[in-house]
Amino acid sequence: MLGAAGSAAAADINKGGQIYSMHCANCHGGSGIPMMPGSPNFQRSEKLFQTDAMLLASIRRGKNAMPAYAGLLRDQEIMDVIAYLRTMQR
């Protein structure tokens, strides 16, 4: 679960952006506007109103076409991505 660094506040936004570019942008779009039907628009997404823990669990398990990232990314890397996603909100 979440450790001492288990919040987006303790996360590294720059690393999150790098990870997002490598693993997420092809479907979710480089600026958060989705490229794949069914992907949330992170610039205007109610998905980002969820807690960090809820988003972490969602990314770990995946959904529909999105793969599960448990085992592919460490929890801290996912938290870095969550922190980066929160910068996309307008």
Language model segments and positions:
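Extracytoplasmic electron-transfer domains, predominantly the class I c-type cytochrome c fold
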Residues: P37, N41-R90
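Electrostatic cytochrome c docking/interface patches
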Residues: L2-I19, M54
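Generic signature of intrinsically disordered, low-complexity, basic-rich segments
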Residues: A4-S7, S21, L48, M79
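Periplasmic/extracellular electron-transfer cofactor-ligation site
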Residues: A11-P40, K63-A65, T87-R90
